[in-house]
Amino acid sequence: MFKGHPKGLLAAALSNMGERFGYYIMNAVLVLFLCSKFGLGEGPAGTIYSFFYAGIYLLSLVGGLIADRTQNYKGTIKTGLVIMASGYVLLSIPILATSGNIGWLLPLTCFALFLIAFGNGLFKGNLQAIVGQMYDNFEAEAAKKGPQALAEAKDKRDSGFQIFYVFI
């Protein structure tokens, strides 16, 4: 399946799959967690969820601007992964707290959600840009070999993005 594609495609696809796995699982239980752990009603829990979800899309713009200004897409992606992982670790702290004063855990949870959204903003769009750059480089190398090789390389871009999106 990956034969004839740039070597980084597998790593990009697996990174994307891992990130989406964690994201969708967390999204599936977030409102239930907020209601059961903190005793929030559906309205306040839904508001937190809505702000988190909106933050993911708004912070993607910020992540794109940062990557464009620095021209360091790989560094931005790595930073996003570290920030997201930090958010997931912080999000696990309230799960471990079983009794006592847990009032401080709701702000911690909201901060963890912000970290996840910001890390996602740094990671998601820039990973797709890196995949596009891989194929730009792949096509440039193929162009040196002739028009037939270039045509084959251009066909690989479409199937490469198809493979990449299957891993979402």
Language model region names:
Residues 17, 87, 100-126:
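Hydrophobic core of transmembrane alpha-helices in multi-pass small-molecule transporters
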Residues 26-45:
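Short amphipathic helix-loop junctions that connect adjacent transmembrane helices
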Residues 55-56, 149-168:
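Glycine-rich segments within core transmembrane alpha-helices of 12-TM secondary carriers
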Residues 47-69, 77, 81, 85, ...:
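Central cavity-lining transmembrane alpha-helices of secondary-active solute carriers
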Residues 122-143, 147-148:
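Intracellular juxtamembrane helix-capping segments at the cytosolic ends
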Residues 1-16, 20, 96-107:
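Cytosolic juxtamembrane N-terminal segment immediately preceding the first transmembrane helix
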Residues 79-105:
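C-terminal ends and interior cores of transmembrane alpha-helices
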Residues 76-77, 109, 161:
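Primarily marks hydrophobic transmembrane alpha-helices of the MFS/SLC 12-helix fold
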